Amino acid sequence: MNKLKLGLIIFTATVIAACSGVSNESQADTGQKSESTAELKTLPLEVFKSPTCGCCGKWISHVKDSGFETKIRNRQSLNAIKAKFDIPSNLQSCHTSVSKDGYFFEGHIPAKYIRKFLDNPPADAAGLAVPGMPAGSPGMEYGDRFQPYKIFLKKKDGSIEVFAEVNTLEEQFNDA
């Protein structure tokens, strides 16, 4: 079996395993916020995900704990929402979020980078993406395992550039 097929099988198995569990967190938006984020400006996100995806529920808990309000849209297929925002297959992940201003946030992007983007959107930006499901990213925690990853900026003209590089587990959450 060639390396590409083996890699595809391993990636598919990881996605299925990560998304097949039901999240322990309630996915209903209760409107409650932790004390540490109560004073932050609350930002709404509409989250499109599979109804059975456990890692999506964990990511939703992460953004809610960081001061975002979420509206969950469970879908059997996410192809239509990804097509609507013209998210190329090489940037796709297991869930797509949309801000009230129409920017998309694809995959396991740490909340601090979404907030940074929304506080000062780059010119001609369409959205941000973390392709795949990097181990250790918010919602994809596996003990101490961490896989460095890039957050990509997609512009309205279709061009893609690196918005941020996340090289350690800690820098996903720290503002330094």
What are these regions (language model features)?
Residues 1-8:
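Bacterial N-terminal signal peptides that target proteins for export
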Residues 15-18:
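C-terminal motif of bacterial Sec signal peptides marking the signal peptidase cleavage site
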Residues 20-23:
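Bacterial signal peptide processing site
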Residues 37-60, 64-66, 99:
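Local sequence-structure signature of Cys/Sec-based thiol-disulfide redox active-site neighborhoods
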Residues 52, 59, 74-77, 110-114:
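Stable alpha-helical elements in mature extracytoplasmic
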Residues 58-68, 83-90, 103-104, 119-122:
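Sec-exported extracytoplasmic/periplasmic mature domains
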Residues 75-87, 133-138:
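Structural microenvironment flanking redox-active thiols in thiol-disulfide oxidoreductases
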Residues 90-175:
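Thiol/selenol-based redox catalytic cores and closely related redox-interacting motifs
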